Amino acid sequence: MAITIKDIALKAGVSHMTVSRALNGSKLVTDETREKILLLAKQLKYKPNLHAKGLVLNKKFSIAVVFSTLSSKTAPSFLLSCLNGVYQSLTKDYNLVIKDLSQGLEHFNLSRADGVIFVSQQESDDEFIRFALAQCTKLVVVNRKIALPNVVSITVDEISAAEMAVNYLLQRDYRKIACINGPELIQSSIDRLAGYQSALTQANLTSAADFVQDGGFSIAGGFVAMQRLLALEDQPDAVFCANDEMAIGALKAINDAGLKVPSDIGLVGFNDSEICQYTTPSLTTIHKPIEQMAKLGGERLFQFKYEIFKQWWK
């Protein structure tokens, strides 16, 4: 039979309310009594009933992590980094519920969660943000700057980061630099393309319209996009890929064409995924602190304070 608060109270010679307060960190209990109760709870292998605890504290012990989309437009490494970061920020009592917006707002019951970490990827996501705020849901938005009031937003300057990637190639004397970008409505795609174009403009360079290809944020998409670039009469001498998955696909296409990176063609990715260390050659990539951003999102969930995450690039 499971040990209850009443069992601990009987052993400790105190009321069950005192035990409850001690286990929940109340300052109404003396340090001596709290230590005694915590020791007994450990000895008796007490495990809290989260449902009962939630009723008392008006908590669900559940955090919803919501993505714009899970089935497409979201790279697996990005998804995993987000979930790892959020998980690190939570206490052992909490559960994660993972959802996306594909089924429509009518399928969301935000009252089942104590708060929402929304990994936003596009402007149309604002509808969900307003929906959550209208329900007085505690909300933190990760990955996109939000101009709405009373929204905690954690993001990074992706335009500057993309400029950094292109400047890396320019500093190595590449001049015909192409871009394999993600889906056009995704905010990261918009910002990274803007950074690519800005860096070229600052270097008094332009790129042909067919130097920008959509790789769909996937390995297969990067492979096909690189094949299209290599098929051009005037081929690029370097490529900036807006995420690492596309860069890996591009690398495969380059190798299949009998070319080598970086001697024949330069290549830079984005996100600093672990797998980039294990390609041949290892991929140069721009670091985006996705996991740290998501972790900070979990930590800030109940603090309604707008904050821009500082630049944090390797």
Residue map of PLM features:
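N-terminal helix-turn-helix DNA-binding module of bacterial transcription factors
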Residues: 1-61
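Short acidic/polar active-site loop segments enriched in Thr and Asp
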Residues: 15, 61, 114, 174-176, ...
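Short gly/ser/thr-rich secondary-structure transition/capping motifs
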Residues: 43-49, 98-101, 120-121, 251
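Alpha-helical recognition/docking segments in bacterial nutrient-uptake
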Residues: 58, 62-167, 230-231
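Hinge/beta->alpha junction and helix N-cap segments in small-molecule ligand-binding domains
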Residues: 68-81, 98-104, 154-164, 180-225, ...
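Short acidic capping loops at alpha-helix termini that bridge into adjacent secondary structure
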Residues: 176, 207-211, 261-266
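Flexible loop/turn connectors
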Residues: 227-314
